[in-house]
UniProtKB/Swiss-Prot annotation:
The record marks 65-66 as: Cleavage (non-hydrolytic). One of its GO terms (molecular function) is adenosylmethionine decarboxylase activity. Changing residue 172 to T: In strain: Canton-S. Pathway: Amine and polyamine biosynthesis; S-adenosylmethioninamine biosynthesis; S-adenosylmethioninamine from S-adenosyl-L-methionine: step 1/1. Binds 1 pyruvoyl group covalently per subunit. PROSITE patterns: ADOMETDC (PS01336). Pfam families: SAM_decarbox. Gene3D superfamilies: S-adenosylmethionine decarboxylase (3.60.90.10). This is S-adenosylmethionine decarboxylase proenzyme. Changing residue 346 to N: In strain: Berkeley. The gene is SamDC. Disulfide bonds: none annotated. The keyword S-adenosyl-L-methionine applies. The active site is at residues 10, 13, 66, 80, 237, 251.
Length: 347
């Protein structure tokens, strides 16, 4: 709530992803952690599990504030509102250790700048505070800000064991933490089309499936098995997982004054241009940010450079910012677009 009593909800999410090093026991698996243990972890975040879906490779959880994904040695938590995901790290690491994973290989914490930062709760009242909190657990972490700090920006904190200088006696113990191909694309959208957003109100559809089909969400990545939820009176979340263990997730805050939609997937593609166009055509934002992470084993590691080209020339999108970063194990592309009056393809 705002100080004057008017309604507000922070759609911008905090995204936390952790990869653990392979354990010596092949039977170790984060998916062995019980639901009750996950509920205890999430109680520190101030969110609850609404529904679950799973296959042989990945477990997906729709939460009261966004989503969680668990695979053998990877954990992803994405939460919106005034949630506090960093506060669950201590408990999470203890659970992981109890299930055979005692070394973090890579950690990523990221978020866009908040619409109402003053409404957030410690340790999320500012990126400096978040970095201080993370540094207390991961003393070799690194923090970044991409985009314009006084306008729209995207914050990132990373930790990687490959950043740590390995002494000779530890070389024989060093694992290949980059053995699994990994890529993630996020599309963060604002100022959405009101007619499209009206689909995600309970007075329009009684169940989430109606909104999923009407909006065309089900056609974005057709191989995904969808678990969706429509909030009362408005708002929408969905998780999709496929037989390869890949995921997608969409979260929608439809209120016109602060509309926000996030799309995320780790589907491996050699070119993300078509996918970006489909997502943007589905939700029709006024502006959006694209981020793509890809490690050296990923199909997208080299081909993500396609988006470094100014595809928006001649279209009704103007690229207002673009930055690339090279990390020890990953490449990152950040690009921001705003609407112009021209017509044509989105990218």
């Amino acid at each position: 709530m705002l100080e004057n009593g008017s309604h507000f909800f922070e759609g911008v999410e905090k995204l936390l992803e952790i990869w653990f090093e392979e354990s010596s026991n092949g039977d170790d698996d984060l998916r062995n952690i019980s639901r009750s243990d996950w509920e205890n972890v999430l109680s520190n975040v101030n969110c609850q599990i609404i529904s679950t879906s799973k296959n042989d490779i990945i477990d997906a959880f729709v939460l009261s504030e966004s989503s969680m994904f668990v695979s053998k040695r990877r954990w992803i938590l994405k939460t919106c509102g005034t949630t506090t995901p960093l506060k669950c790290l201590g408990q999470l690491l203890k659970l992981a250790e109890a299930n055979g994973y005692n070394v973090v290989a890579d950690l990523f914490y990221s978020r866009k700048n908040f619409t109402r930062p003053e409404a957030q709760i410690t340790p999320h009242q500012g990126f400096t505070e978040e970095v201080t909190y993370l540094d207390s657990i991961f003393p070799n972490g690194r923090s970044y800000c991409l985009g314009s700090m006084n306008l729209e920006c995207w914050y990132l904190y990373t930790f990687s064991r490959s950043d740590i200088k390995i002494t000779p006696q530890l070389i024989s113990d060093e694992k290949n933490v980059d053995s699994d191909p990994d890529q993630t694309i996020e599309i963060l959208m604002q100022d959405l089309d009101p007619e499209t957003m009206s689909i995600f109100y309970k007075n329009k559809f009684n169940d989430a499936n109606g909104a999923t089909v009407k909006s065309g969400i089900d056609t974005i990545l057709p191989t995904m098995h969808i678990d969706d939820f429509l909030f009362d009176p408005c708002g929408y979340s969905m998780n999709g997982i496929n037989d390869k263990g890949e995921y997608m997730t969409i979260h929608i805050t439809p209120e016109n004054q602060f509309s926000y939609v996030s799309f995320e997937t780790n589907v491996a593609l050699s070119n993300y241009r078509k996918l970006i166009n489909q997502v943007i055509n589905t939700f029709k934002p006024g502006k959006f940010i694209v981020t793509i992470f890809a490690n050296k084993c990923s199909l997208a590691y080299e081909t993500m450079k396609e988006l470094e080209v100014e595809y928006s020339q001649g279209s009704h999108w103007k690229r207002t910012d673009m930055q690339c970063c090279n990390f020890p194990s990953y490449n990152l592309l950040f690009a921001q677009y705003s609407h112009s009056e021209k017509t044509g393809d989105y990218l």
